[in-house]
């Protein structure tokens, strides 16, 4: 099972919150104290809470569940994309489009358009167009890929969303809440933990912290998927034995 230790978190700077004047009082239970005007997060809480979240994600993946990684602020976007791809899951790393979950029917049409344009770009259709038309379609393709590339193969709503930066991604969290989709989120001292099923109190700005979270979630999803594949192989073997 994937777990993260106190040492891992200390080395990654997970315990450094925001300046005390920007705090959200709802995060008080998770704050150890303050140092040089910066809140220090109590890792005695964060370690077990994150490991519980990892176990949940692993369990979702073990049942062929879909994990959607969400992190659109600059510090998080690259790690979000890399980690989601590494475990063959899904991601939103550019901008959360309103209705991405709650208006899935419309999003699905945009994904279909994206896939059509991808086909046209490789089957020679673009070559038959005027330069201007080809350029317009190329731009449309790039725009759709940027917004929807990480979810184009999701094939339906996710079973859990994993969020870096609860404040920044409040629309995604609200949409998941409306649909009853569980939310795992890293929540810094300036953010609200409301609407989050698995709260991970921690630094949501430092690259090292963000990579620790995203890589751990990817490892948990991989481990869960491995269990699923092992069970499948066992069942397949059982059928062959008959």
UniProtKB/Swiss-Prot annotation:
Coiled coil start-end: none
Membership in a protein family: Belongs to the universal ribosomal protein uS2 family.
Keywords in alphabetical order: Ribonucleoprotein, Ribosomal protein
InterPro entries xrefs: Ribosomal_uS2 (IPR001865), Ribosomal_uS2_bac/mit/plastid (IPR005706), Ribosomal_uS2_CS (IPR018130), Ribosomal_uS2_flav_dom_sf (IPR023591)
Gene Ontology terms: biological process: translation
Organism: Shewanella sediminis (strain HAW-EB3)
GO CC annotation, single: cytosolic small ribosomal subunit
Entry's transmembrane regions: none
Single GO MF descriptor: structural constituent of ribosome
Stated name of the protein: Small ribosomal subunit protein uS2
Annotated gene: rpsB
One Pfam family hit: Ribosomal_S2
PANTHER family to which the protein is assigned, alphabetical: 30S RIBOSOMAL PROTEIN S2 PROKARYOTIC AND ORGANELLAR, SMALL RIBOSOMAL SUBUNIT PROTEIN US2M
């Amino acid at each position: 099972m994937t777990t993260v230790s106190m040492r891992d978190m200390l080395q990654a700077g997970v315990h450094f919150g925001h300046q005390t004047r920007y705090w959200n009082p709802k995060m008080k239970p998770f704050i150890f104290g303050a140092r040089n005007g910066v809140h220090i997060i109590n890792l005695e809480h964060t370690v077990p809470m994150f490991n519980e979240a990892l176990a949940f994600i692993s369990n979702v993946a073990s049942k062929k569940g879909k994990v959607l990684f969400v992190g659109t602020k600059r510090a998080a976007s690259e790690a979000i994309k890399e980690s989601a791809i590494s475990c063959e899951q899904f991601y939103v790393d550019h901008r959360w489009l309103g209705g991405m979950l709650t208006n899935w029917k419309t999003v699905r049409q945009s994904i279909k358009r994206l896939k059509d344009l991808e086909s046209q770009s490789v089957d020679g259709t673009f070559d038959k167009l005027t330069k201007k038309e080809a350029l317009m379609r190329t731009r449309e393709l790039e725009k759709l890929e940027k917004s929807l590339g990480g979810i184009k193969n999701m094939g339906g709503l996710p079973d859990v969303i994993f969020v870096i930066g609860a404040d920044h991604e409040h629309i995604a969290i609200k949409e998941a809440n409306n649909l009853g989709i569980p939310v795992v989120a890293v929540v810094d001292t300036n953010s609200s933990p409301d609407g989050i099923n698995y709260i991970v109190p921690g630094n949501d700005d430092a690259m090292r912290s963000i990579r620790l979270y995203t890589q751990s979630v990817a490892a948990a999803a991989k481990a869960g998927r491995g269990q699923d594949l092992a069970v499948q192989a066992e069942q397949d073997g059982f059928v062959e034995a008959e």
